[in-house]
Amino acid sequence: MSSQDLSGKIALVTGASRGIGAAIADTLAQAGSTVIGTATGDSGAAAIGERLAQWNGQGRALNAAEADGIENLIADIEKEFGKLDILVNNAGITRDNLLMRMKEEEWDEIMQVNLKSVFRASKAVLRGMMKQRSGRIINITSVVGAMGNAGQANYAAAKAGL
């Protein structure tokens, strides 16, 4: 990645506890951005906070499936730091099961976290980004969205939706 100065920029990275999300959060923080990374629970959020503390970043708990959760989180971030400049929609879960055995709840949970949370988060930051005439929304998908795997119809559908 090129070394771009992101000093003064505010970034939210959902699903920042490990993997791609952690790497993105760390990279944005190292480039000077104030990064808020999310995890599903308090212990994960604390670990993100410890990791990002050297760059003045924070970890926050977020249940991406909850309708009010993402809107409330973004409102809190904007009160504390100002309007977001960067949103990385990375939160994602799997509930693998063959479609013929899949419960509707397994389908719905994946859609809520992996797809609908992207809509909610993006909608919540758009007004501020448009008002400041700048901002970036980055949606992390998967190759599984283009070419599914057995037992992942729900995950493939959500990632293809991005």
Which residues are covered by each model-predicted region?
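Residue(s) in the substrate-gating loop at a strand-loop-helix junction
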Residues: 142
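Substrate-binding pocket helix/loop in short-chain dehydrogenase/reductase
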Residues: 98-99, 106-111, 137
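Conserved glycine-rich cofactor-binding loop
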Residues: 10, 17-18
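Active-site helix of classical SDR
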Residues: 122, 158
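The beta1-alpha1 cofactor-binding region of Rossmann-like NAD(H)/NADP(H)-dependent oxidoreductases
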Residues: 62-72, 104
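Conserved glycine-rich Rossmann-like NAD(P)H-binding loop of the short-chain dehydrogenase/reductase
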Residues: 31-47
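Active-site loop immediately N-terminal to the catalytic Tyr-X3-Lys motif
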Residues: 100, 147-153
